[in-house]
């Protein structure tokens, strides 16, 4: 059985990858045919599929990081994830559906720190070669207001 400890460890490694700017590793947390979406609670509750960020493959996630590194121009900043404990809704030895609350602080190059996003990850995990991978991650943000500077993944 996939358990909460495995998912919590996975989420900690996921957050550390983003927070430490090891972005090129971020897509490896997902399956090849994954779905990743950042949306808000109102859109999610209404069943609206479109999100602020939307990708339907690991290749799209890799392209997002390439654009972040090579093409996009944005004010230098970094994130710090604060994660709650995961709750498994269903699962077996190779798959699990879980939710995990999150808060992301954004630290600007000036040192200014603010709450950038809070919400809940809605995840579908699978195992590949004995390792957890995300088949789907929907980051449902509590606020309907999103800063246009969402360059880094949640």
Swiss-Prot record:
Functional description taken from the UniProt entry: Component of the terephthalate 1,2-dioxygenase multicomponent enzyme system which catalyzes the dioxygenation of terephthalate (TER/TPA) to 1,2-dihydroxy-3,5-cyclohexadiene-1,4-dicarboxylic acid (DCD). It can also use 2,5-dicarboxypyridine (PDC) and 1,4-napthalenedicarboxylic acid (NDC) as substrates, and preferentially uses NADPH which is the physiological electron donor.
MF terms in GO: iron ion binding; terephthalate 1,2-dioxygenase activity
pH dependence: Optimum pH is 7. About 20% of maximum TPADO activity is observed at pH 9, whereas no activity is observed at pH 5.
Sorted UniProt keywords: Dioxygenase, NAD, Oxidoreductase
Catalytic activity, as annotated: terephthalate + NADH + O2 + H(+) = (3S,4R)-3,4-dihydroxycyclohexa-1,5-diene-1,4-dicarboxylate + NAD(+)
Name the record gives this protein: Terephthalate 1,2-dioxygenase, terminal oxygenase component subunit beta 2
Regulation: Inhibited by EDTA.
Family: Belongs to the bacterial ring-hydroxylating dioxygenase beta subunit family.
One Pfam family here: Ring_hydroxyl_B
EC number: 1.14.12.15
Single GO biological process annotation from the record: phthalate metabolic process
Subunit structure: Heterotetramer composed of 2 alpha (TphA2I and TphA2II) and 2 beta (TphA3I and TphA3II) subunits. Part of a multicomponent enzyme system composed of a reductase (TphA1I or TphA1II) and a two-subunit oxygenase component (TphA2I or TphA2II and TphA3I or TphA3II).
Membrane spanning stretches: none
Required co-factors: Fe cation
Protein's gene: tphA3II
Temperature sensitivity of activity: Optimum temperature is 30 degrees Celsius. Approximately 60% of maximum TPADO activity is observed at 15 degrees Celsius, and activity is completely lost at 50 degrees Celsius.
InterPro entries: NTF2-like_dom_sf, Rng_hydr_dOase-bsu
Top-rank EC class of the record's enzyme: oxidoreductase
């Amino acid at each position: 059985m996939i358990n909460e400890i495995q998912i919590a460890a996975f989420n900690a490694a996921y957050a550390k990858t983003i927070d430490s700017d090891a972005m090129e590793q971020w897509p490896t947390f997902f399956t090849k045919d994954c779905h990743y979406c950042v949306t808000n609670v109102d859109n999610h509750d209404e069943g609206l599929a479109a999100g602020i960020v939307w990708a339907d493959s690991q290749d799209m996630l890799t392209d997002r990081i390439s654009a972040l590194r090579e093409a996009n121009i944005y004010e230098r900043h970094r994130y710090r994830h604060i994660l709650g404990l995961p709750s498994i809704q269903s699962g077996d030895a190779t798959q699990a559906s879980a939710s995990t609350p999150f808060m992301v602080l954004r630290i600007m190059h000036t040192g200014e720190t603010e709450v950038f996003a809070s919400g809940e990850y809605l995840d579908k995990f699978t195992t590949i070669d004995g390792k957890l991978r995300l088949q789907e991650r929907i980051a449902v943000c509590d606020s309907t207001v999103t800063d246009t500077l969402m360059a880094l993944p949640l």
